[in-house]
């Protein structure tokens, strides 16, 4: 069986990516049902037993910026070794709620960690490995902030300022501009129906 495909969903908090991920998974499962492949859904930070434990620390405990970035990449290495790479080798499809682009956007763009440090970690942890498709849900931080305000217990990223998310969004868009061959940008200000129509178009060409 041919190697599977790796698809990531990205966007600032409040952009709606997680809401649409489950719907996308259902449609993708319908597409691959006759091929004997499975669809694996995962997330970052997290995705493994170790990752889920440390996820709570990363999301809720204040820490040094470089420690934060190192933890993200350490968890990613385990995620790749334990979940992503084995699934792709089996021929399965993997959907991940965030991956490396989030680290460049949040720790790089948002927090200001130098890009060269992140690129060094990326090369060490991933080699040349990248997603086959990254769906970026793009939304103005002011609108995303209104959506996030409904969250009952926001984590320390969700609690960041609009200025932080402006920087994060800008870095996401920079990443997309540098790798247009794997990015699909969706305007999250659209209606759910319009967004799902765009996602259907992506599934059709996978």
Swiss-Prot record:
GO cellular component: cytosol
Enzyme class: transferase
GO molecular function ontology, one term from the record: ATP binding
EC number(s) reported in the record: 2.7.4.9
InterPro entries, per database record: P-loop_NTPase, Thymidylate_kin-like_dom, Thymidylate_kinase
A biological-process GO annotation: dTDP biosynthetic process
Residues where ATP binds: 11-18
Annotated catalysed reactions: dTMP + ATP = dTDP + ADP
Gene3D superfamilies according to UniProt: P-loop containing nucleotide triphosphate hydrolases
Annotated CDD domains: TMPK
Keywords: ATP-binding, Kinase, Nucleotide biosynthesis, Nucleotide-binding, Transferase
Task performed by this protein: Phosphorylation of dTMP to form dTDP in both de novo and salvage pathways of dTTP synthesis.
HAMAP family: Thymidylate_kinase
Recorded family membership: Belongs to the thymidylate kinase family.
Protein name: Thymidylate kinase
Name of the gene encoding the protein in the UniProt record: tmk
């Amino acid at each position: 069986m041919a190697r599977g495909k790796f698809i990531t969903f990205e966007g600032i908090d409040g952009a709606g990516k997680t809401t649409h991920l489950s719907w996308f998974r259902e449609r993708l499962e319908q597409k691959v049902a006759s091929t004997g492949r499975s669809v694996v859904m995962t997330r970052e930070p997290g995705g493994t037993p170790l990752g889920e434990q440390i996820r709570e620390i990363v999301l809720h405990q204040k820490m040094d910026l470089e420690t934060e970035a190192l933890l993200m990449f350490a968890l990613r290495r385990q995620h790749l070794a334990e979940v992503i790479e084995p699934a792709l080798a089996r021929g399965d499809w993997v959907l991940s709620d965030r991956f490396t682009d989030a680290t460049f956007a949040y720790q790089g763009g948002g927090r200001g960690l130098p890009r060269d440090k992140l690129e060094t970690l990326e090369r060490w942890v991933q080699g040349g490995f990248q997603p086959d498709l990254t769906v970026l849900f793009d939304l103005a931080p002011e609108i995303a902030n209104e959506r996030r305000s409904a969250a009952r217990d926001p984590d320390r990223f969700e609690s960041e300022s609009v200025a932080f998310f402006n920087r994060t969004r800008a870095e996401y868009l920079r990443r997309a501009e540098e790798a247009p061959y794997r990015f699909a940008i969706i305007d999250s200000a659209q209606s759910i129906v319009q967004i799902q129509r765009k996602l259907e178009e992506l599934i059709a060409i996978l």
